[in-house]
Every structure is written in C-alpha cells, then in structure tokens.
C-alpha cells in the first residue's frame, strides 16, 4: 500500500463547465451549435441543475448565449478569447502559489496528488490523469486560503489542453514534470519561484490550446 489519499474533485457545475469549455475551445462543439439542458445533462451523466449553472458560468465567459427555452447557443471562440482566459488563470494561480508559501500552508494534499499521478504514469496509466491534474490545481487553490480566488478559479477550470499533435501520454508526462517543479518550489517555500513555475505551466497550456486556431 502506498498510503495515498482519495483524489478530490470539483463540484458538478464546475465539472460540467470544464467539459463544455474544453469542447468549445477545441472546436469539438462548433460555433452556432445549440445545447439543450436535457441532452447535455444526459450526455454528461448529471442532473439538469449543474448544467443550468454551467451554462450561466460559460455565458459570463462569453462562450454561450443562454436562451429562454432551456437551451444555449455556442458563440465564436477567438485567439484573443483563449489568450485572455489563460492569462487570467496564470495570474490567479501564480498568486495562489505565492499565498501557499507566504501562509506556510500544509502541502500534504498537494504532495498526494503529485505522488498519485507519478505512480500511475510510471505504469503509463493515463486514464485518470484528468482527475489527478484537476486535484493538483484544486488543492493549491484550497491551500492558498483565499476563498474568493478558489471559487473564481473553479469556474475558470477547463481541464487538460492537449495540442492537436500531442498524444495523451506525452501530454500527461509533460504536465506531471511541470507539476513536480511547482511542488518543489512550494516545498522550498519559494514564493517567487512557485509563481513563476505555475505561470509557465498555465501559459504552456495556452500555447497547446492555441494549436487549434493557429
């Protein structure tokens, strides 16, 4: 036994928003597509309530236009939209890392995420890496102690940003390597280094997402 703890997941509305945001950014759901509450809920295996809440989150992001008849229309996504999204995430998550260091936060849950992912990837098991990745970021937001920042970052979450020419395993290994650098800086209580490593990590994800548009 490795003594690892369960991975924590985001609330349902953020998971739904993440799945939809990723599909819209990667163009799996095209501009102009109509999404209904019932069909989206059925496809994602959730109730209608978190889908309705996710529609509102994505409407605030400018990705959906919510209609009165329980549906939403996918709006166009541009390079500018993607850059602004990731630049905001980089700024907020970099600050979250700094707060972890400045507050001398307990890093045990963050370490658990790194160790669990490392064990899985050592056997080339990538099936659950989406959850490991999500939990790593979530635990940093939690450890920052800033509840408003955590809530905003939860709504901004969009999961893995795998580029068009990258395999799932290569992406996971690259992401995990970056996570280990972030954790090492957090463990050293180096606020500036942890912020820099996190910003680099998020902006690399931005570059991967932009491969669908450039």
Predicted regions and their residues:
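Short linear motifs at protein or domain termini
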Residues: 1-102, 210-214
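Short helix-capping and inter-helix turn/linker motifs at the boundaries of alpha-helical repeat units
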Residues: 11, 107-108, 170-174
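Mobile beta-alpha loop/short-helix "lid" or hinge segments that flank ligand
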Residues: 60, 64-65, 158, 172-173
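Short amphipathic alpha-helical interaction/hinge segments
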Residues: 160-168, 206-213
